[in-house]
Amino acid sequence: MSKLKTRKSAAKRFKATATGKFTRRRAFHNHLLDHKSSKLKRHLKTKAVVDERDADNVKLMIPYA
C-alpha cells in the first residue's frame, strides 16, 4: 500500500499532543486588537484543544501525527 499524503495546510495549523489530541491557535488575534482588552488578548494567545467532534477529520488530514 502506498504512503498516505499529509495535508500541509493542516500540518501547519495543528499539532498533536502526547495523549493523541490536537492543539490549535485561537482566532481573532491577528489584527484589529486596539479595542480588545488585555485579558482577552492574553487569553487568545494560549493554545486550544481541537474539539473531539473535529479531531477525527484532523487525524485524517495528518495521518502520521
Swiss-Prot record:
GO molecular function ontology, one term from the record: structural constituent of ribosome
GO BP of this protein: translation
Signal peptide extent: none
A Pfam match: Ribosomal_L35p
Alphabetized UniProt keyword annotations: Ribonucleoprotein, Ribosomal protein
An annotated GO cellular component: cytosolic large ribosomal subunit
Protein family: Belongs to the bacterial ribosomal protein bL35 family.
HAMAP family: Ribosomal_bL35 (MF_00514)
Protein name: Large ribosomal subunit protein bL35
Gene name of this polypeptide: rpmI
